[in-house]
A protein has these predicted regions:
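C-terminal and inter-domain tail/linker signature
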Residues: 4-5, 13, 23-173
Length: 173
């Protein structure tokens, strides 16, 4: 009996270590969200950079909603096509760069830089000026596509780089 107790005491810690390793190794690992989301994000950035509007529906969901600063929401694939086309018209050499991306389950946060030369017509007359702005975008994914896009950037920095100025209202001191 004494020998049995000694054997159990000697092998007990080893048994506990093996049991712990087996049980913790059996836990199902969560998939890395970047595996699915990064190719979608990369293709979206490529579309912004090359202007291939035929591929927009491969990246953005039909019911996508895009919110930017305080502007009205853009909805659907056709809305995304108009936004991308508008930027590509105003800035024919537009380049969107992902500086940092954080992937999470069904979401990604993107810190980006946008550069281009304002030689095309858009909401404002072309100025011929080069711009460089950065912003943050929160992307939501569903069914392998972007379903929601929330964008924030400093619009005043953009306006100033284009050569426009903020004029205070009359009567302000």
């Amino acid at each position: 009996m004494k020998q049995l107790i000694q054997t159990i005491l000697k092998t007990g810690p080893l048994f506990l270590v093996i049991a712990f390793m087996v049980l913790s190794g059996c836990q199902q690992q969560k998939p890395d969200p970047s595996q699915e989301q990064k190719p979608i994000l990369d293709k979206g950035i490529a579309i912004w950079n090359n202007g291939n509007l035929d591929e927009v529906g491969e990246v953005w969901d039909e019911s996508v909603v895009r919110s930017v600063n305080q502007l009205p929401d853009v909805k659907g694939v056709e809305g995304m096509k108009k936004v991308i086309s508008g930027f590509r018209t105003a800035y024919p050499d537009a380049k969107l760069t992902a500086n940092e991306v954080i992937f999470a389950e069904n979401k990604a946060i993107l810190r980006w830089t946008f550069t281009g030369t304002n030689t095309g017509s858009g909401e404002m007359p072309p100025t011929g000026k080069k711009i460089k702005i950065w912003g943050i975008t929160i992307l939501h994914f569903a069914n392998g596509k972007i379903s929601r896009e929330i964008v924030a950037y400093n619009n005043q920095a953009l306006i100033e780089q284009l050569g426009f100025a903020m004029i205070p209202p009359k009567g302000s001191k």
